[in-house]
Each structure stands twice: as C-alpha cells, then as structure tokens.
A protein has these predicted regions:
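Substrate-binding pocket helix/loop in short-chain dehydrogenase/reductase
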Residues: 96-97, 104-106
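C-terminal helical subdomain
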Residues: 179-180, 196-235
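The beta1-alpha1 cofactor-binding region of Rossmann-like NAD(H)/NADP(H)-dependent oxidoreductases
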Residues: 59-71, 102
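Residue(s) in the substrate-gating loop at a strand-loop-helix junction
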Residues: 139
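Conserved glycine-rich cofactor-binding loop
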Residues: 13-15
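Conserved glycine-rich Rossmann-like NAD(P)H-binding loop of the short-chain dehydrogenase/reductase
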Residues: 27-44
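Active-site helix of classical SDR
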Residues: 120, 155
Length: 235
C-alpha cells in the first residue's frame, strides 16, 4: 500500500514528529524530516534509517516560507514526489497574559499558526499532483482553554480553524486534510524530561500509529478532526 510513498514531517527530530516519522519509515514510507539544527536533523535521520534512499534530513524553520519552499524542493529532487505532509513543528510558552511578552506571543503564532500555513503553501502543488494527505498536529488546547494558555490557546485554536477551512478548500483536488488534537504526550515539550512518570501519557509512537491508520483508511472517508487523550487521567 505504501510502496514508493513519501512523507514530510516538520519538527521531526524528536518527540511527536520523530515518533511519527519512525512508524511511517518502519512501514516502508520514505520520510523527510525537518528541524532547525543540523546536528539534530542528522542524528534523527540516522536513527530512523541508515539507508539514505529511505530518509532525508532537512534543516528548515517553518517560520521562514522560503526555507519551507526549499525543503519541498529538496524532497522532490531526492525522492521524486511528495504524498504526505505532517505539519508537526510547534512550541509553547505558558504565562499569565499580563506577563506574556510580545516576542513570546509572536514566537507561538509564527510557529504554530503561520508556520502551518507556510508548510501547506509550500507543499500544496505537490500534493495536488499526488492527490495526497496533509495532517496538522494541533492540540486539545485548540478547543479547550486554560490558565496561562492565552498565547498557546490562540495559536492552536487558529491551527484547528485553519486546517478545517483548508480541508474544505482542497477537497476538490482530492487532497485530504485532517487535524490531530492530542492531549498529554510524553515528550520534551515545555521542559519535560520523559521518564517512567510519563507512562500514563500518550506516547509519540501512538500518534505515529494513528497517522498510519488515517493513511490506511478507505479514500472515500475523511477523519477531518481527531481528538486523542490518555485513556486514564494521571492519579
């Protein structure tokens, strides 16, 4: 089913993005991952596969549209096509709104929302050719607001709205668009250090398997918005 398919995962050097890339690669999908640091990109790519014909590491920042255009061009030159895009890159700062700086606000909006647009804008023509799939990784914070989350909530509410509107726009090209909204995930996000204490949380590979299941669905069906949370709360 996945023979010769190619996926691009932004923020793919660790956490959710790496978990998704590893699962897709294990299923025979050729993967390109991006990150902001060369050493992180190289290390993650080597962990995904030692075969350069199956994995491509790219240094890119989703806040830079030209960098995302270049990333897609590299993918096409290396693999010849692009079938799946998983827009995963994201960040968060959690402070009361009166303490949140302008720079912190802009960092979140430019990464979590504008970066999402840049990634889709840079890849959409290739997805038209392949009649491919675009998935954004948003958050339950895109529908549930909370204390100290004003900037993060705004960016993730926006990400959900953007992705759902894009889904309607792109259906006529046979491009499928979904957004995944995870709850607590065991990653390094917000200074967390994954350990045994995180065993109750969603694991990155769980999201990789979810993405894989979405790609396996009959093409007549489109799971446009998916909430996923730990099955049991942390006690």
């Amino acid at each position: 089913m996945f023979q010769n398919k190619v996926a691009y995962i932004t923020g793919g050097t660790k956490g959710i993005g790496f978990g998704i890339a590893k699962i897709l690669s294990d299923q025979g999908i050729r993967v390109a991952i991006s990150g902001r640091k060369q050493e992180d990109v190289e290390k993650a790519a080597a962990e995904i596969s030692s075969d350069a014909s199956k994995v491509l590491g790219i240094v890119s920042n989703v806040r830079n549209f030209e960098a995302e255009e270049k990333a897609v061009s590299e993918i096409k030159n290396h693999f010849g096509q692009l079938d799946y895009v998983v827009a995963n890159a994201g960040m968060g700062v959690f402070k009361p709104v009166d303490e949140l700086s302008v720079d912190e606000w802009n960092d979140m909006i430019e990464t979590n929302l504008t970066g999402l647009f840049y990634t889709l804008k840079a890849s959409v023509e290739e997805l038209k050719k392949s009649e491919g799939y675009f998935i954004s990784i948003s958050s339950l914070a895109g529908t549930n607001f909370f204390e100290k989350g004003s900037g993060y909530n705004a960016s993730k509410f926006g990400a959900v709205g953007f992705t759902q509107a894009a889904m309607i726009d792109l259906r006529k090209y046979n491009i499928k668009v979904s957004t995944i909204m995870p709850g607590s995930v065991s990653t390094n996000f917000n200074g967390n250090e994954p350990s045994g204490k995180d065993s109750w949380k969603i694991q990155p590979e769980d999201l990789g398997n979810l993405v894989l299941d979405i790609f396996k669905m009959n093409p007549r069906s489109l799971p446009s918005k998916i909430e996923i949370r730990p099955s049991k709360p942390n006690n």
